């Protein structure tokens, strides 16, 4: 998601979107760069109950002007590989790696290969992972995937743009399968326009199931819907994943991918002590995408209680009326 609240036009207040959906830990996906990360770390993140970590944008100021300029990589002078890598190394535990947006509005096709190369260099120098926004890429998807190594993340992987994980015949591209085989993570990164129901169905029918389920929660432009985590888990269950698999893809698996599995993602002794309790509601529920495709399901996870570090940080209204428990 994007949690540099007050620092970018697309960021949200994490507590208002995470805790009430059963989420205790949010990963900011490149809202800040090396020039403004300190402000996000020192003044924004501490004002939240939600545990917040981040990926550092390859551009110096992240998404500070994305709602005005459309993206942060229109001029390659905004990238400084060494300062980006140094910032990540100086903030181990808070910064997990590098984020680069390969979207046609964020970077021109003639600059996209350069931005990918520099993002790869910064990730390697920092020792962190590389997350790439692949939805709407101005260059062929295989060229983007060529830069990704084991443990790196292809987010918005199930988008419906021309350069999606499917080829023109609707088959999963061989380059995508090769990337998965070498350990590249296929992340949902749902957002409002970056997850196409028909692409998900086709990919899953061919054995390409999401590694991780994420919201890319942000302040959406008018006319767009952005789902919270409990709805996404429910939606992907309706799309054919088992409920245990959807839960794993939104808890334990992301913790592994982000190298946080020693503290987060499960309830074994010694972990942070985070948990979420849901009502499993039965009925008729419909989720949609911006292409007009709908998914109908029979169950939905409704948040009831969220616990972080062994302490209740959010509770549904009925529980408040019951008193202390």
What kind of region is each of these model predictions?
Residues 1-47:
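Metal-associated gating/positioning segment near the N- to mid-region
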Residues 1-10, 68-82:
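Active-site mouth loops of central-metabolism enzymes
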Residues 14, 39-40, 84, 119, ...:
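Aromatic/hydrophobic pocket-lining residues that form π-stacking "cages" and hydrophobic walls in ligand
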Residues 16, 20-24, 47-51, 56-77, ...:
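Active-site gating loops and adjacent loop-to-helix segments of metal-dependent hydrolytic enzymes
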Residues 22, 40, 98, 154, ...:
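Divalent metal-coordination and catalytic microenvironments
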Residues 102-223:
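Active-site core of metal-dependent hydrolases
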Residues 198-280:
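His/Asp/Glu-enriched, well-ordered alpha-helical/loop segment
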Residues 272-324:
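C-terminal cap of metal-dependent C-N hydrolases
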